[in-house]
Design a protein with these regions (language model features):
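Extracellular or lumenal secretory-pathway regions
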Residues: 2-295, 302-465
Length: 465
């Protein structure tokens, strides 16, 4: 009777072990497939997917923080001395992003307008929008450089007109005016003398195109046909490529619109088209990490992002170039001598930093980064940082430019930052981190259990003999 009980027990254990092995094996094979299917179903742009409402109205709180560079020695700069700068701010804005005119097309693409609305946050800022700062008179100094090649008599006329308008090389205006626009009779004067030189009327502000406006009509892939194409830009404002630059490679519209990427990312690089910089940008993988428990890949700007054509030949199309580390954006900024760079000329030619007083580039403060969840291609935490610079110099024939020594002068730098938090983070964590890892553990638990069960069964069988 003892032997029969043992036999029954060993058969039972053996069957239990086999069952565990079977379940574990199934999970091992099917688990990743189920997870993959779930991810695909939920990241494509489809009104029935989890991430659709998140894609439509981004629930992540975004902040725009702006630092101005005040010129402390404007009088001396006019005499040819080195500019001394003092960083003011940050002036922080809460940024709301949402999409309108969402239209699905037959070829698995969707088009939309992305809007940004900004609201000043006094409690997060160091100062108010009423603060006065001394900065270059952007329109006048920009126009002066643009008119350098014009006939002398025309420059003389402009110079006289500027005098009549009491225009000087530097201006003392409020943060609010410089950002959101100020009326300037100079705009009308330039439009009268040199029609078409500047394409705007009435008001001028550096961030006018940022607020209560959209960044152009994006048409992107929905991923319904091919998930590896999801979010990839098909066209921008109806264009398959832009024509700001001098090479077809530089004019290419690559990557996504900069909000999400295709899932199952490899730790190599990611690309997006930036309407603000008028070009595609490629960031490179730096390291893996975790953000609030969610695994992430960190992508950063390569040293070559704003390199000149000599140091990095593929960038030749963005020239005419100056030193490495600044990019001429005049072609997409109504031909004004504007340059973008990393803040404080981080990762740029040291001569740019040395040409002014008061810059302290550092990786911690001035490097941009994107932390993306590689399984879904959704960013968890990001901070995109850029600096706007104006090339100023003495322009003969325009007396207002004095004896200014040619310099790429930082005007301001800004960071657009956001990180996932609250209910959005919790839902994300549960569905895409917790459940997959539970499935992962279960397969090993079942497989792990099957071994002692089968061994026990075998031992009992042997003892029975």
């Amino acid at each position: 009777a003892m032997a029969a009980a043992r036999r029954r027990l060993s058969v039972g254990l053996g069957l239990a072990g086999a069952a565990c092995a079977l379940v574990g094996g199934c999970l091992l094979l099917v688990g990743p497939v189920i997870i993959r299917e779930q991810v695909i179903k939920n990241v494509r742009i489809d009104p029935s997917s989890i991430s659709f409402s998140m894609w439509k109205d981004i629930p992540v709180p975004f902040y725009l923080s702006v630092h101005f560079f005040e010129v402390l020695n404007a009088e001396q700069v006019l005499l040819g001395e080195k500019p001394v700068l003092s960083q003011r701010g940050p002036y922080v804005y809460r940024e709301y992003r949402y999409k309108t005119n969402i239209t699905f097309h037959d070829n698995a693409t969707v088009s939309f307008l992305e809007h940004r609305n900004l609201f000043f946050q006094p409690d997060l800022s160091n100062g108010t929008e009423e603060d006065y700062v001394v900065v270059p008179n952007i329109i006048m100094m920009g126009a002066a450089v643009m008119m350098e090649k014009l006939p002398r008599f025309l420059k003389y006329l402009v110079s006289k007109a500027l005098e009549g308008l009491q225009q000087e090389a530097f201006m003392n205006r409020t943060v609010g005016e410089i950002m959101w626009g100020y009326e300037d009779r100079l705009i009308d004067t330039i439009n009268t003398f040199v029609p078409g030189l500047i394409p705007f009327k009435g008001k001028f502000g550096l961030f006018m195109q940022f607020n209560n406006s959209n960044s152009g009509l994006f048409t992107v892939n929905t991923g319904m046909k091919n998930i590896s194409q999801v979010h990839m830009v098909d066209s921008w404002n109806g264009l398959k490529k832009v024509n700001y630059w001098r090479s077809s490679e530089c004019n290419m519209i690559n990557g996504t619109s900069g909000e999400m990427w295709p899932p199952f990312m490899s730790p190599t690089s990611l690309e997006f088209y930036s309407p603000d910089a008028c070009r595609s940008m490629k960031l490179v993988y730096e390291q893996s990490g975790k953000f609030k428990g969610v695994p992430t890949y960190r992508f950063v700007a390569p040293k070559t992002l704003f390199a000149n054509g000599t140091d990095y030949p593929p960038n030749e199309g963005f020239c005419p170039c100056m030193q490495s580390g600044i990019q001429n954006v005049s072609t997409c900024r109504f031909n004004a001598p504007m340059f973008i760079s990393h803040p404080h000329f981080y990762n740029a030619d040291p001569s740019l930093v040395d040409a002014v007083e008061g810059l302290h580039p550092s990786r911690e403060e001035h490097a941009l980064f994107l932390d993306v969840h590689p399984m879904t291609g959704i960013p968890m935490n990001c901070s995109i940082k850029l600096q706007l610079n104006l090339y100023i110099k003495k322009v003969s024939g325009i007396s207002q430019t004095g004896n200014i020594y040619p310099v790429v002068l930082p005007l301001l730098w800004f960071a657009e930052s956001g990180s996932i938090e609250g209910p959005v983070l919790n839902e994300f964590y549960t569905n895409l981190v917790l459940i997959p890892s539970v499935l992962d553990y279960l397969q090993y638990i079942f497989l792990g259990l099957s071994v002692p069960l089968i061994i026990s069964a075998a031992v009992l069988m042997v003892m029975n003999k």
